[in-house]
Amino acid sequence: RMAIDAGADVVLGSGPHVTRAVDLYKNRFIAYSLGNFCTYGMFNLDGPKGVAPLLALNINEKGEFISAKVTSIFQQDNEHLVIDPSGKAFQLLKQLTQSDIPEAALQFSEDGIITKKPLKN
C-alpha cells in the first residue's frame, strides 16, 4: 500500500515463492505475490509452490483497476510452463483473498476474471 501511496498504479509482488492474496487499494490493484512462475530445479514445486497466476490487467488512463484475467500456470518437471485447465492458481488467489483480506473490494467469477465489487448504496 505504501507503493500506491507513493504513486504506483499497480503493485506486483514476489518473494515468498507462493501465490498470495490480491487487493484493491485506492482503486489500484495489488498482487502480494505471484508465486513461482518459472524457476529452476533447486525449488520444490509441490502443492501451492508449483502454481502461479498469469495476470492480464485492465486499468484505465488514470491507473485505476478495471479487471484482471487470470490464467493458471504450473511448471511441469521444473522446466516447462503449462496452462492449468483446473484453474488452481485462480482458486488459490480467490481463497486467500477471501480469507486474508475479506474487506477487499474484489469479486471473482468462475471463468477466471477479477473485477471490482459493485458499490453498495
Predicted regions and their residues:
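A short C-terminal boundary segment appended to hydrolase-like catalytic domains
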Residues: 46-121
